[in-house]
């Protein structure tokens, strides 16, 4: 059994609830433990994961959040920089599944967040589990 930290950027409560439920269900189905940490926004997710990874309390991480395109350039910054930060941590050997949705509208986000539909929270958790298995295989 491994311990995972689900780090959620809580902005759209109903969508986040679905993403977290999907991630938690996928982790528990494999016999893993899950804890949830909430941060203000998607840009804070990589930093929170980096801090949590320092103490070795968790074996892997699931990044959760929803970024919906608005009328300004802010969407591109948040979507790109949060993904870049997560990728950089993954390249450093931290097992992270990225479940931060970047969509054009709320309907697309709902389709992807709902565990009964596309279940992107569950997919992100499964990705984190897969990366943790690779860590074990390669002794990282």
UniProtKB/Swiss-Prot annotation:
It catalyses: (2S)-2-hydroxy-3-oxobutyl phosphate + 5-amino-6-(D-ribitylamino)uracil = 6,7-dimethyl-8-(1-D-ribityl)lumazine + phosphate + 2 H2O + H(+). The keyword Protein biosynthesis does not apply. It is an enzyme of class 2 (transferase). 5-amino-6-(D-ribitylamino)uracil binds at residues 11, 42-44, 66-68, 98. GO terms for molecular function: 6,7-dimethyl-8-ribityllumazine synthase activity. GO terms for biological process: riboflavin biosynthetic process. SUPFAM superfamilies: Lumazine synthase. Pfam families: DMRL_synthase. Catalyzes the formation of 6,7-dimethyl-8-ribityllumazine by condensation of 5-amino-6-(D-ribitylamino)uracil with 3,4-dihydroxy-2-butanone 4-phosphate. This is the penultimate step in the biosynthesis of riboflavin. This is 6,7-dimethyl-8-ribityllumazine synthase. It comes from Erythrobacter litoralis (strain HTCC2594). The gene is ribH.
């Amino acid at each position: 059994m491994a311990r995972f930290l689900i780090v959620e950027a809580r902005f759209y409560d109903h969508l986040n609830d679905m993403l977290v439920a999907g991630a938690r269900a996928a982790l528990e189905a494999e016999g893993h433990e899950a804890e949830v940490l909430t941060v203000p926004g998607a840009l804070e997710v990589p930093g929170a994961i980096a801090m949590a990874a320092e103490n070795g309390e968790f074996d892997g991480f699931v990044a959760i959040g929803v970024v919906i395109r608005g009328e300004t350039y802010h969407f591109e910054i948040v979507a790109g920089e949060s993904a870049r930060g997560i990728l950089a941590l993954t390249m450093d050997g931290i097992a992270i599944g990225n479940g931060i949705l970047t969509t054009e509208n709320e309907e697309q986000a709902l389709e992807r967040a709902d565990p009964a539909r596309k279940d992107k929270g569950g997919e992100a958790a499964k990705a984190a589990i897969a990366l943790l298995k690779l860590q074990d295989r390669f002794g990282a």
